[in-house]
Amino acid sequence: GSVVLFDPARDLAIIAVPRLSAPALALGDQLGRSDDAVIAGFPLDGPLRVDAARVRDRILATGQDIYGQAGVTRHIYSLYSRVESGNSGGPLLDTSGRVVGVVFARSVDDDHTGYALTLEEAAPVLQAAAAARAAVSTGACISG
């Protein structure tokens, strides 16, 4: 596949995969505090793993983009779940399997706190992806 849309502020990339036969996942509704959820991903470069999560809160957070530039504000979920490298970019699902967010980070202070963009925050990128066809640059590589 190739990256056809990239948003460094939201830390989202859309990858076009020609001839992919899998159906798109359905979109769900906004989650509230204490709602159960599911994180799906490939933590630590391993096989697909699905882990339980619970919404701690839905917050408007200000932080850095992927290049370390400050001042990025995003609608996110704070989650009680173990998020590992390899979960980032994976879906946050409701208990019916519908996408309600996109996992993007874990806490540096608490092994059992992760973060996901809300569907509302990811929506502009997802909507623009429908018309995206040409490969785009993802910018310079970063370490860490």
Indicate where each model-derived feature is located:
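Conserved active-site neighborhood of the chymotrypsin/trypsin-like protease fold
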Residues: 1-49, 133, 137
